[in-house]
């Protein structure tokens, strides 16, 4: 069995495809990860561990120790490479592309091999990547995530303390500080969604309709914000690790 792990900036998700076991821990509870996995599966049956980590080198070092389960398991960290048979990266310096974005694109390409794709990840940052029907990454956009943007505003507003910002489907003028912030941030992201639509509409004529795929912790708001049908998949990075494993066999 193979263990797949997605270590993000706030949470760590894991998945064992062969038995469909999965779970999530807070990144600050990293010491609990191995124990949680061992409580659900028979770790003696694990043959390999594949990891996506965007949380920094120190977390990567901790993960390598935790996920070896004291069995000298090969813990392999995904690194961006290009070209691959299904995806060619647009970045001139490919190592500067976030491995999570790359893996998400691999997963989407596997699912929609003949369609133009827009991949939106609404996490601590909101990223959008565009991939042609031929598997050519055209580039993308990065803006602060919903909660990241909210924290930046709260830090300069001493009379407002909110743990989590909830966006609105359609913005209108706010009537207090909190409401003004959520209305304003909602309007900003509405503009982002409109630009994604415009870019897709302005691209070359296609035989199949484009695929818009949304993932990340704040995916629900973005799902309803698009006027076109959207595919929601909260596990794109984990699925991308599985695709990468197959490509490298």
Swiss-Prot record:
Source domain of life: Bacteria
UniProt KW Plastid keyword: no
Single biological process term from Gene Ontology: coenzyme A biosynthetic process
Cellular component GO terms held in the UniProt record: cytoplasm
InterPro entries: ATPase_NBD (IPR043129), Type_III_PanK (IPR004619)
Catalytic activity: (R)-pantothenate + ATP = (R)-4'-phosphopantothenate + ADP + H(+)
Function: Catalyzes the phosphorylation of pantothenate (Pan), the first step in CoA biosynthesis.
Subunit structure of this chain's protein: Homodimer.
Protein name: Type III pantothenate kinase
Organism: Teredinibacter turnerae (strain ATCC 39867 / T7901)
């Amino acid at each position: 069995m193979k263990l797949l792990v997605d270590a993000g900036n706030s949470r760590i998700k894991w998945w064992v495809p062969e038995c469909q076991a999965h779970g999530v821990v807070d990144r600050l509870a990293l010491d609990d990860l191995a124990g949680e996995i061992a409580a659900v599966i028979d770790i003696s049956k694990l043959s390999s561990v594949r990891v996506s980590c965007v949380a920094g080198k120190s977390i990567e070092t901790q993960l390598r120790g935790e996920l070896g389960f004291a069995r000298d398991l090969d813990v392999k960290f995904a690194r961006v490479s290009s070209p691959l048979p299904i995806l060619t990266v647009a970045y001139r310096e490919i190592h500067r592309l976030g491995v999570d974005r790359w893996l998400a694109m691999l997963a989407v390409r596997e699912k929609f091999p003949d369609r133009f794709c827009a991949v939106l990840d609404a996490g601590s940052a909101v990223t959008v990547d565009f991939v042609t029907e031929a598997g050519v990454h055209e580039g993308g956009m990065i803006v602060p995530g919903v909660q990241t943007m909210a924290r930046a505003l709260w830090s300069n507003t001493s009379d407002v303390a909110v743990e989590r910002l909830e966006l609105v489907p359609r913005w209108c003028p706010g009537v207090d500080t909190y409401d003004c912030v959520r209305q304003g941030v909602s309007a900003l992201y509405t503009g982002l969604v409109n630009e994604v639509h415009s870019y897709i509409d302005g691209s070359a004529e296609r035989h199949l309709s484009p695929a818009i795929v949304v993932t990340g912790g704040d995916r629900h708001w973005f799902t309803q914000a698009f006027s076109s049908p959207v595919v929601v998949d909260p596990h794109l990075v984990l699925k991308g690790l599985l695709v990468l494993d197959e490509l490298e066999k």
